[in-house]
Amino acid sequence: MAREFKRSDRVAQELQKEVAVILQREVKDPRIGMVTVSDVEVSRDLAYAKIFVTFLFDNDPEAIKQGMKGLEKAAPYIRSLLGKAMRLRIVPELRFVYDQSLVEGMRMSNLVSNVIKNDEAKHVAEDSE
């Protein structure tokens, strides 16, 4: 019988929870600020983890750049805390990636809203003629 989830998926879910807690409670770097862990991808051999993050200040590219530098600097410390919190033989090497999917989703939503608004205005103008 096949398992419902692969082990790497289960480890990724647990990593997401633990990293979110560590970033919220343990990491004190002011460059990081309010960060959200949106997703985690773990390699099949569990040696590498790609952690997708978003920031509260998504509209400021310089703040995002500084936040990512802060996360890269804190990665070894976060990894050591993960080693204490999780029972893994090998704690994955962490790589932080800025997740633009939320920003792109908002942009697409705004584009659709604008098209609908323009279409409704066009129909109202045609009906009044």
Swiss-Prot record:
<keyword id="KW-0690">Ribosome biogenesis</keyword>
<dbReference type="InterPro" id="IPR015946">
    <property type="entry name" value="KH_dom-like_a/b"/>
</dbReference>
<dbReference type="InterPro" id="IPR023799">
    <property type="entry name" value="RbfA_dom_sf"/>
</dbReference>
<keyword id="KW-0963">Cytoplasm</keyword>
<protein>
    <recommendedName>
        <fullName>Ribosome-binding factor A</fullName>
    </recommendedName>
</protein>
<comment type="similarity">
    <text>Belongs to the RbfA family.</text>
</comment>
<dbReference type="InterPro" id="IPR020053">
    <property type="entry name" value="Ribosome-bd_factorA_CS"/>
</dbReference>
<comment type="subunit">
    <text>Monomer. Binds 30S ribosomal subunits, but not 50S ribosomal subunits or 70S ribosomes.</text>
</comment>
<dbReference type="GO" id="GO:0030490">
    <property type="term" value="P:maturation of SSU-rRNA"/>
</dbReference>
<dbReference type="Pfam" id="PF02033">
    <property type="entry name" value="RBFA"/>
</dbReference>
<dbReference type="InterPro" id="IPR000238">
    <property type="entry name" value="RbfA"/>
</dbReference>
<dbReference type="GO" id="GO:0043024">
    <property type="term" value="F:ribosomal small subunit binding"/>
</dbReference>
<comment type="function">
    <text>One of several proteins that assist in the late maturation steps of the functional core of the 30S ribosomal subunit. Associates with free 30S ribosomal subunits (but not with 30S subunits that are part of 70S ribosomes or polysomes). Required for efficient processing of 16S rRNA. May interact with the 5'-terminal helix region of 16S rRNA.</text>
</comment>
<dbReference type="GO" id="GO:0005829">
    <property type="term" value="C:cytosol"/>
</dbReference>
